[in-house]
Protein backbone atom coordinates (compact mmCIF):
# COMPACT_ATOMS: atom_id res chain seq x y z
CA UNK A 1 0.00 0.00 0.00
CA UNK A 2 1.24 3.50 -0.84
CA UNK A 3 2.44 5.66 2.02
CA UNK A 4 0.31 8.77 2.36
CA UNK A 5 0.86 11.88 4.48
CA UNK A 6 -1.59 14.72 5.09
CA UNK A 7 -0.17 18.19 5.69
CA UNK A 8 -2.92 20.51 6.89
CA UNK A 9 -2.47 24.26 6.61
CA UNK A 10 -3.74 25.86 9.81
CA UNK A 11 -1.51 28.92 10.10
CA UNK A 12 -3.66 31.67 8.59
CA UNK A 13 -4.57 34.72 10.66
CA UNK A 14 -8.31 34.52 9.91
CA UNK A 15 -8.79 38.28 10.08
CA UNK A 16 -12.16 38.17 8.29
CA UNK A 17 -13.56 36.18 11.22
CA UNK A 18 -12.70 38.88 13.76
CA UNK A 19 -13.60 39.17 16.60
CA UNK A 20 -14.01 35.36 16.82
CA UNK A 21 -10.33 34.99 15.90
CA UNK A 22 -9.12 37.68 18.26
CA UNK A 23 -7.81 35.07 20.70
CA UNK A 24 -7.77 31.88 18.63
CA UNK A 25 -6.74 30.57 15.22
CA UNK A 26 -9.50 30.28 12.63
CA UNK A 27 -9.44 26.43 12.59
CA UNK A 28 -10.06 26.49 16.37
CA UNK A 29 -13.29 28.51 16.09
CA UNK A 30 -16.25 26.48 17.44
CA UNK A 31 -18.77 25.11 14.96
CA UNK A 32 -22.00 23.19 15.29
CA UNK A 33 -22.16 23.34 19.07
CA UNK A 34 -19.43 20.90 20.07
CA UNK A 35 -16.89 20.87 17.24
CA UNK A 36 -14.01 23.04 16.04
CA UNK A 37 -13.71 23.90 12.34
CA UNK A 38 -10.56 21.80 12.01
CA UNK A 39 -12.43 18.67 13.14
CA UNK A 40 -14.04 18.37 9.71
CA UNK A 41 -10.86 17.97 7.66
CA UNK A 42 -9.26 15.74 10.31
CA UNK A 43 -12.37 13.54 10.45
CA UNK A 44 -12.39 13.26 6.66
CA UNK A 45 -8.83 11.94 6.67
CA UNK A 46 -9.38 9.60 9.61
CA UNK A 47 -12.60 8.20 8.13
CA UNK A 48 -10.79 7.75 4.79
CA UNK A 49 -8.03 5.69 6.39
CA UNK A 50 -5.37 8.40 6.23
CA UNK A 51 -3.91 8.28 9.72
CA UNK A 52 -0.72 10.36 9.46
CA UNK A 53 -1.53 14.05 9.75
CA UNK A 54 0.71 17.04 10.38
CA UNK A 55 -1.10 20.28 11.25
CA UNK A 56 1.02 23.33 10.43
CA UNK A 57 0.16 26.09 12.91
CA UNK A 58 1.30 29.67 13.38
CA UNK A 59 -0.97 32.50 14.58
CA UNK A 60 -2.61 32.35 18.03
CA UNK A 61 -2.29 28.59 18.05
CA UNK A 62 -2.63 27.85 21.78
CA UNK A 63 -6.35 27.02 21.66
CA UNK A 64 -5.83 24.93 18.52
CA UNK A 65 -2.87 23.05 19.98
CA UNK A 66 -4.83 22.28 23.14
CA UNK A 67 -7.73 20.96 21.11
CA UNK A 68 -5.51 18.74 18.97
CA UNK A 69 -3.74 17.26 21.98
CA UNK A 70 -7.00 16.47 23.78
CA UNK A 71 -9.31 15.52 20.93
CA UNK A 72 -6.99 13.79 18.46
CA UNK A 73 -5.02 11.16 20.34
CA UNK A 74 -4.50 8.31 17.91
CA UNK A 75 -2.88 4.89 18.17
CA UNK A 76 0.81 5.75 18.12
CA UNK A 77 2.11 2.17 18.06
CA UNK A 78 0.33 1.67 14.71
CA UNK A 79 1.95 4.80 13.31
CA UNK A 80 -1.25 6.83 13.57
CA UNK A 81 -1.02 10.43 14.69
CA UNK A 82 -2.27 13.99 14.44
CA UNK A 83 0.61 16.30 15.32
CA UNK A 84 0.68 20.07 15.59
CA UNK A 85 3.78 21.55 13.97
CA UNK A 86 4.37 25.18 15.00
CA UNK A 87 6.25 27.57 12.75
CA UNK A 88 9.92 27.04 13.61
CA UNK A 89 11.82 29.43 11.29
CA UNK A 90 13.90 26.53 9.98
CA UNK A 91 14.95 28.42 6.84
CA UNK A 92 15.56 31.85 8.33
CA UNK A 93 14.05 34.46 10.60
CA UNK A 94 10.71 34.61 8.81
CA UNK A 95 7.29 33.26 9.66
CA UNK A 96 5.41 31.50 6.87
CA UNK A 97 5.21 33.81 3.87
CA UNK A 98 2.34 31.83 2.36
CA UNK A 99 0.91 28.33 2.03
CA UNK A 100 3.71 27.07 -0.24
CA UNK A 101 6.35 28.49 2.09
CA UNK A 102 4.73 26.64 5.00
CA UNK A 103 5.47 23.36 3.23
CA UNK A 104 8.95 24.51 2.21
CA UNK A 105 9.86 25.37 5.79
CA UNK A 106 8.82 21.86 6.84
CA UNK A 107 10.53 19.76 4.18
CA UNK A 108 12.27 17.92 7.01
CA UNK A 109 8.92 16.27 7.79
CA UNK A 110 8.69 14.91 4.26
CA UNK A 111 12.29 13.66 4.44
CA UNK A 112 11.58 11.87 7.72
CA UNK A 113 8.22 10.38 6.73
CA UNK A 114 9.13 9.30 3.17
CA UNK A 115 5.54 9.32 1.81
CA UNK A 116 4.66 8.45 -1.77
CA UNK A 117 1.83 10.99 -1.88
CA UNK A 118 1.07 14.11 0.11
CA UNK A 119 -2.30 15.77 0.66
CA UNK A 120 -2.05 19.52 1.22
CA UNK A 121 -5.43 20.61 2.58
CA UNK A 122 -6.81 23.68 4.31
CA UNK A 123 -8.10 23.53 7.88
CA UNK A 124 -10.98 25.97 7.64
CA UNK A 125 -13.71 24.39 5.51
CA UNK A 126 -16.87 22.51 6.49
CA UNK A 127 -17.61 19.40 4.41
CA UNK A 128 -17.44 15.61 4.23
CA UNK A 129 -15.05 13.97 1.77
CA UNK A 130 -13.60 10.52 1.18
CA UNK A 131 -10.04 11.54 0.36
CA UNK A 132 -9.13 8.03 -0.80
CA UNK A 133 -11.33 8.54 -3.85
CA UNK A 134 -9.24 11.58 -4.75
CA UNK A 135 -6.08 9.49 -4.31
CA UNK A 136 -7.48 6.76 -6.59
CA UNK A 137 -8.27 9.41 -9.22
CA UNK A 138 -4.74 10.84 -8.91
CA UNK A 139 -3.12 7.44 -9.37
CA UNK A 140 -5.38 6.44 -12.27
CA UNK A 141 -4.53 9.65 -14.12
CA UNK A 142 -0.82 9.34 -13.23
CA UNK A 143 -1.01 12.98 -12.21
CA UNK A 144 1.80 15.09 -10.86
CA UNK A 145 -0.78 17.05 -8.89
CA UNK A 146 -4.53 16.82 -8.44
CA UNK A 147 -6.65 19.80 -7.42
CA UNK A 148 -10.04 19.30 -5.75
CA UNK A 149 -12.71 21.55 -7.26
CA UNK A 150 -16.39 22.17 -6.72
CA UNK A 151 -18.96 23.12 -9.37
CA UNK A 152 -20.44 26.58 -8.81
CA UNK A 153 -22.94 28.59 -10.91
CA UNK A 154 -21.03 30.38 -13.61
CA UNK A 155 -22.30 33.79 -12.45
CA UNK A 156 -20.54 33.15 -9.10
CA UNK A 157 -17.25 32.24 -10.75
CA UNK A 158 -15.89 35.75 -10.34
CA UNK A 159 -15.57 35.11 -6.61
CA UNK A 160 -13.24 32.09 -6.88
CA UNK A 161 -10.11 30.70 -8.46
CA UNK A 162 -11.60 29.00 -11.52
CA UNK A 163 -10.13 26.04 -13.39
CA UNK A 164 -10.53 25.38 -17.10
CA UNK A 165 -10.33 21.63 -17.76
CA UNK A 166 -10.33 19.41 -20.80
CA UNK A 167 -12.74 16.50 -21.34
CA UNK A 168 -10.25 14.16 -19.64
CA UNK A 169 -10.10 16.33 -16.50
CA UNK A 170 -6.64 17.75 -17.14
CA UNK A 171 -6.15 21.39 -16.20
CA UNK A 172 -5.81 23.74 -19.15
CA UNK A 173 -5.85 27.04 -17.29
CA UNK A 174 -6.09 28.48 -13.78
CA UNK A 175 -7.85 31.85 -13.52
CA UNK A 176 -8.07 33.93 -10.35
CA UNK A 177 -11.56 35.50 -10.07
CA UNK A 178 -12.09 35.82 -13.85
CA UNK A 179 -14.67 38.20 -15.34
CA UNK A 180 -15.74 35.54 -17.85
CA UNK A 181 -15.37 32.10 -16.19
CA UNK A 182 -14.97 29.11 -18.54
CA UNK A 183 -17.77 26.51 -18.14
CA UNK A 184 -17.03 22.99 -16.99
CA UNK A 185 -17.21 20.22 -19.63
CA UNK A 186 -20.78 19.18 -20.38
CA UNK A 187 -22.42 21.87 -18.26
CA UNK A 188 -22.38 25.42 -19.64
CA UNK A 189 -24.16 26.82 -16.55
CA UNK A 190 -21.46 25.73 -14.09
CA UNK A 191 -17.73 26.26 -13.65
CA UNK A 192 -15.13 24.56 -11.46
CA UNK A 193 -13.84 26.48 -8.44
CA UNK A 194 -10.70 25.40 -6.63
CA UNK A 195 -11.30 24.22 -3.05
CA UNK A 196 -7.70 24.90 -2.06
CA UNK A 197 -7.14 21.17 -1.48
CA UNK A 198 -4.27 19.49 -3.33
CA UNK A 199 -2.72 16.06 -3.73
CA UNK A 200 0.88 15.77 -4.93
CA UNK A 201 3.23 13.01 -5.83
CA UNK A 202 5.97 13.66 -3.30
CA UNK A 203 8.85 14.37 -5.66
CA UNK A 204 6.73 16.94 -7.51
CA UNK A 205 5.74 18.77 -4.33
CA UNK A 206 9.33 18.97 -3.08
CA UNK A 207 10.59 20.17 -6.45
CA UNK A 208 7.92 22.86 -6.74
CA UNK A 209 8.22 24.37 -3.27
CA UNK A 210 12.01 24.48 -3.59
CA UNK A 211 11.65 26.21 -6.96
CA UNK A 212 9.12 28.65 -5.49
CA UNK A 213 11.29 29.47 -2.48
CA UNK A 214 14.09 30.57 -4.81
CA UNK A 215 11.79 33.10 -6.49
CA UNK A 216 11.87 36.27 -4.40
CA UNK A 217 9.02 37.77 -6.43
CA UNK A 218 6.68 34.88 -5.64
CA UNK A 219 3.61 35.20 -3.42
CA UNK A 220 4.51 31.72 -2.09
CA UNK A 221 0.86 30.69 -2.41
CA UNK A 222 -0.22 27.31 -3.79
CA UNK A 223 -2.93 28.66 -6.05
CA UNK A 224 -1.22 31.81 -7.28
CA UNK A 225 2.38 30.58 -7.37
CA UNK A 226 2.49 26.78 -7.67
CA UNK A 227 -0.61 25.53 -9.48
CA UNK A 228 -0.78 28.48 -11.88
CA UNK A 229 2.64 27.49 -13.26
CA UNK A 230 2.80 23.73 -12.70
CA UNK A 231 -0.04 22.82 -15.08
CA UNK A 232 1.93 24.32 -17.98
CA UNK A 233 4.72 21.75 -17.68
CA UNK A 234 3.27 18.75 -15.84
CA UNK A 235 0.02 16.75 -15.76
CA UNK A 236 -2.25 18.52 -13.28
CA UNK A 237 -5.73 17.03 -13.04
CA UNK A 238 -8.92 18.29 -11.44
CA UNK A 239 -10.98 16.11 -9.12
CA UNK A 240 -14.68 16.98 -9.19
CA UNK A 241 -15.76 17.02 -5.55
CA UNK A 242 -19.41 16.65 -6.60
CA UNK A 243 -18.57 13.06 -7.62
CA UNK A 244 -17.27 12.16 -4.16
CA UNK A 245 -19.45 9.60 -2.36
CA UNK A 246 -19.45 9.34 1.42
CA UNK A 247 -21.13 6.43 3.26
CA UNK A 248 -24.43 7.40 4.86
CA UNK A 249 -24.68 10.64 2.89
CA UNK A 250 -27.91 11.53 1.12
CA UNK A 251 -27.81 12.67 -2.50
CA UNK A 252 -28.67 16.26 -1.59
CA UNK A 253 -25.62 16.46 0.69
CA UNK A 254 -23.17 15.52 -2.04
CA UNK A 255 -21.01 18.48 -2.95
CA UNK A 256 -21.75 20.41 0.27
CA UNK A 257 -18.68 22.53 1.02
CA UNK A 258 -18.48 25.82 2.86
CA UNK A 259 -15.53 28.16 3.10
CA UNK A 260 -16.46 29.86 6.36
CA UNK A 261 -14.19 32.78 5.56
CA UNK A 262 -16.32 35.58 6.98
CA UNK A 263 -18.76 35.81 9.86
CA UNK A 264 -21.93 36.00 7.78
CA UNK A 265 -21.04 32.78 5.91
CA UNK A 266 -19.93 31.17 9.17
CA UNK A 267 -23.21 32.13 10.82
CA UNK A 268 -25.34 30.82 7.96
CA UNK A 269 -23.37 27.57 7.82
CA UNK A 270 -24.25 26.98 11.46
CA UNK A 271 -27.86 27.86 10.78
CA UNK A 272 -27.90 25.23 8.02
CA UNK A 273 -27.53 22.60 10.74
CA UNK A 274 -30.78 23.38 12.58
CA UNK A 275 -33.10 22.79 9.64
CA UNK A 276 -35.55 19.91 10.00
CA UNK A 277 -33.97 18.27 6.96
CA UNK A 278 -30.52 19.90 6.79
CA UNK A 279 -28.39 20.02 3.67
CA UNK A 280 -25.41 19.12 5.85
CA UNK A 281 -26.38 16.49 8.40
CA UNK A 282 -24.22 16.02 11.49
CA UNK A 283 -26.14 12.84 12.37
CA UNK A 284 -24.33 10.49 9.96
CA UNK A 285 -22.81 7.78 12.14
CA UNK A 286 -21.22 6.10 9.11
CA UNK A 287 -18.99 9.14 8.61
CA UNK A 288 -18.80 10.74 12.07
CA UNK A 289 -17.23 14.08 12.86
CA UNK A 290 -14.79 13.38 15.68
CA UNK A 291 -13.98 15.88 18.39
CA UNK A 292 -12.96 16.18 22.02
CA UNK A 293 -14.98 13.99 24.38
CA UNK A 294 -16.10 15.59 27.61
CA UNK A 295 -17.54 14.59 30.95
CA UNK A 296 -20.33 17.14 31.09
CA UNK A 297 -23.76 15.95 32.24
CA UNK A 298 -26.68 15.78 29.80
CA UNK A 299 -28.54 18.91 28.77
CA UNK A 300 -31.44 19.78 31.07
CA UNK A 301 -34.71 21.67 30.53
CA UNK A 302 -36.49 22.84 33.67
CA UNK A 303 -39.69 24.65 34.68
CA UNK A 304 -43.02 24.07 33.00
CA UNK A 305 -45.12 26.92 34.38
CA UNK A 306 -47.15 27.63 31.26
CA UNK A 307 -49.54 29.94 33.08
CA UNK A 308 -46.71 32.37 33.86
CA UNK A 309 -44.84 31.74 30.57
CA UNK A 310 -41.93 30.16 32.38
CA UNK A 311 -41.25 27.04 30.33
CA UNK A 312 -37.74 25.78 29.63
CA UNK A 313 -37.74 24.58 26.02
CA UNK A 314 -35.78 24.58 22.76
CA UNK A 315 -37.07 24.04 19.21
CA UNK A 316 -35.14 23.60 15.95
CA UNK A 317 -31.98 23.90 18.02
CA UNK A 318 -28.74 22.01 18.62
CA UNK A 319 -28.10 21.77 22.37
CA UNK A 320 -24.73 20.43 23.55
CA UNK A 321 -23.88 18.68 26.80
CA UNK A 322 -24.04 20.52 30.09
CA UNK A 323 -26.60 23.11 28.96
CA UNK A 324 -29.46 24.17 31.23
CA UNK A 325 -32.53 25.83 29.77
CA UNK A 326 -34.05 27.11 32.99
CA UNK A 327 -37.47 28.51 32.16
CA UNK A 328 -36.25 30.21 28.97
CA UNK A 329 -37.10 29.75 25.30
CA UNK A 330 -34.58 28.90 22.56
CA UNK A 331 -35.45 28.68 18.86
CA UNK A 332 -33.38 28.04 15.72
CA UNK A 333 -30.08 28.29 17.56
CA UNK A 334 -26.86 26.39 18.28
CA UNK A 335 -25.75 26.02 21.90
CA UNK A 336 -22.24 24.89 22.84
CA UNK A 337 -21.56 23.08 26.15
CA UNK A 338 -22.44 24.61 29.52
CA UNK A 339 -24.75 27.34 28.24
CA UNK A 340 -27.46 28.52 30.63
CA UNK A 341 -30.60 30.36 29.55
CA UNK A 342 -32.53 31.68 32.53
CA UNK A 343 -36.23 32.25 33.08
CA UNK A 344 -38.39 34.34 30.77
CA UNK A 345 -35.54 34.91 28.31
CA UNK A 346 -35.95 34.37 24.56
CA UNK A 347 -33.07 33.36 22.28
CA UNK A 348 -33.65 33.12 18.53
CA UNK A 349 -31.42 32.48 15.50
CA UNK A 350 -28.25 32.69 17.58
CA UNK A 351 -24.98 30.89 18.32
CA UNK A 352 -24.03 30.68 21.99
CA UNK A 353 -20.50 29.43 22.68
CA UNK A 354 -19.31 27.50 25.72
CA UNK A 355 -20.11 28.79 29.20
CA UNK A 356 -22.40 31.61 28.08
CA UNK A 357 -25.06 32.67 30.56
CA UNK A 358 -28.21 34.51 29.53
CA UNK A 359 -29.79 36.32 32.49
CA UNK A 360 -33.51 36.56 33.16
CA UNK A 361 -35.88 38.40 30.82
CA UNK A 362 -33.35 38.87 28.02
CA UNK A 363 -34.20 38.98 24.32
CA UNK A 364 -31.44 37.77 21.98
CA UNK A 365 -31.82 37.56 18.20
CA UNK A 366 -29.32 36.91 15.35
CA UNK A 367 -26.30 37.02 17.63
CA UNK A 368 -23.04 35.15 18.08
CA UNK A 369 -21.98 35.25 21.72
CA UNK A 370 -18.46 33.94 22.28
CA UNK A 371 -17.17 31.92 25.21
CA UNK A 372 -17.41 33.00 28.86
CA UNK A 373 -19.84 35.88 28.35
CA UNK A 374 -22.59 36.69 30.83
CA UNK A 375 -25.55 38.67 29.54
CA UNK A 376 -27.12 40.58 32.44
CA UNK A 377 -30.85 40.39 33.17
CA UNK A 378 -33.16 42.41 30.95
CA UNK A 379 -30.66 42.88 28.10
CA UNK A 380 -31.95 43.18 24.52
CA UNK A 381 -29.59 42.29 21.64
CA UNK A 382 -30.39 42.10 17.94
CA UNK A 383 -33.48 44.32 17.87
CA UNK A 384 -32.04 47.84 17.64
CA UNK A 385 -29.34 48.10 14.92
CA UNK A 386 -28.16 51.54 16.04
CA UNK A 387 -27.76 50.52 19.66
CA UNK A 388 -26.16 47.19 18.68
CA UNK A 389 -23.53 48.95 16.55
CA UNK A 390 -22.78 51.33 19.39
CA UNK A 391 -22.02 48.51 21.81
CA UNK A 392 -20.92 45.54 19.71
CA UNK A 393 -19.49 44.35 16.40
CA UNK A 394 -22.24 43.97 13.76
CA UNK A 395 -21.58 42.22 10.43
CA UNK A 396 -22.75 43.50 7.01
CA UNK A 397 -25.50 40.88 7.25
CA UNK A 398 -26.72 42.28 10.57
CA UNK A 399 -25.37 39.57 12.89
CA UNK A 400 -24.31 40.90 16.31
CA UNK A 401 -21.01 39.46 17.57
CA UNK A 402 -19.96 39.64 21.23
CA UNK A 403 -16.27 38.72 21.75
CA UNK A 404 -14.93 36.12 24.14
CA UNK A 405 -15.04 37.17 27.78
CA UNK A 406 -16.56 40.60 27.10
CA UNK A 407 -18.08 42.31 30.12
CA UNK A 408 -21.56 43.25 28.93
CA UNK A 409 -23.33 45.98 30.87
UniProtKB/Swiss-Prot annotation:
Coiled coil: none annotated. The keyword Chaperone does not apply. Keywords: ATP-binding, Carbohydrate metabolism, Glycogen biosynthesis, Glycogen metabolism, Nucleotide-binding, Nucleotidyltransferase, Transferase. Its EC number is 2.7.7.27. GO terms for molecular function: ATP binding; glucose-1-phosphate adenylyltransferase activity. Alpha-D-glucose 1-phosphate binds at residues 96, 161, 176-177, 194. Homotetramer. Belongs to the bacterial/plant glucose-1-phosphate adenylyltransferase family. This is Glucose-1-phosphate adenylyltransferase. The lineage of its organism: Bacteria, Pseudomonadati, Myxococcota, Myxococcia, Myxococcales. The gene is glgC.
Amino acid sequence: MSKVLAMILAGGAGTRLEPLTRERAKPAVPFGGRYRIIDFVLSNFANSGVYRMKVLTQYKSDSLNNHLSRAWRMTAFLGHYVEAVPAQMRTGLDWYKGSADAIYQNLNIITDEEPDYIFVFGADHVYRMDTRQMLDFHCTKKAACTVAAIPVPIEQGREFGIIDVGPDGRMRQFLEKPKDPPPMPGNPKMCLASMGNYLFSTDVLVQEVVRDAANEASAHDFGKSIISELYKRAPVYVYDFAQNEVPGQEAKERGYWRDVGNIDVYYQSNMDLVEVDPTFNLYNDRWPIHTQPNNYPPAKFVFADEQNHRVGHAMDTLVAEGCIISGGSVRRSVLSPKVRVNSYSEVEDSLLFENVTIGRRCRIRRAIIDKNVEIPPGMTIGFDPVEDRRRFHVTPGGVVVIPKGMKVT
